[in-house]
Amino acid sequence: QALMPLSLNYRMSDDYKPRFGRTVIRGDLWKGFYQDMGNVAKEGGIAFANGKKPVRLIKQLLKWANNTKDGIVLDFFAGSGTTAHAVMEANAEDGLNRTFILVQLDEVPDPKSTAAKEGFATIADLSAERLRRAGKKVLEGECHPDWNRDVGFRVLKIDSSNMADVF
C-alpha cells in the first residue's frame, strides 16, 4: 500500500478555482474550527486541555487526505488521542475502515493538571481511556451500514531500551 503525503492533497485558495487538479479551500473555512477550540477541553470525555485539537478538524484533514477504504492514519504525538477518536467517528460516518497508529512517550502529566487529579499516571493512559470512551460513544450513535464497527485498539508498551545514553 502506497503512502500518499497530505501535501499532495492540500488545497489552498480563496477564489474557488481548482489548481493543478486540487480542490479548493475557502479562506473562511477555518472560522468554524476556531470556534471549536472553545469547547475542545470537553471532547472525548477526558479532562486534558493542553494541546487538544477539535475532533472535527482532524476529521476534515482525513477527508482531505483522500484515504482509501483500509487506509492507515499515523500520529506520532498522540496526546489525548484526538486523531484516533476522529478516525473512529469518520469511519462510522463514511463506512471506511481506516486504522490508526498512535505513538506517545511515557510522559507523566503535570501534577496540578486535571488529568493527574483524575488518576492518570501517564498521558498514554489518558489516551487509552479516551479511546475506550470514544469507541463506546461512536457505537451508541448512528453508523454507516458498510462500516465494520471496529473500535478496538491494542497498546504496545516499550518497557526498556537497548540504546546507550549518549549525553
Locate predicted features.
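Class I S-adenosyl-L-methionine
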Residues: 1-72, 94, 107-110
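Hydrophobic/aromatic beta-strand patches that form the interior of the parallel beta-sheet core
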Residues: 30, 101-103, 156
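SAM-dependent methyltransferase catalytic region
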Residues: 113, 117-167
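Conserved S-adenosyl-L-methionine
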Residues: 55-137
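Short non-domain terminal segments
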Residues: 8, 18, 75, 151-154, ...
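Intrinsically disordered, low-complexity boundary segments flanking structured domains
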Residues: 11-20, 88-90, 136-145
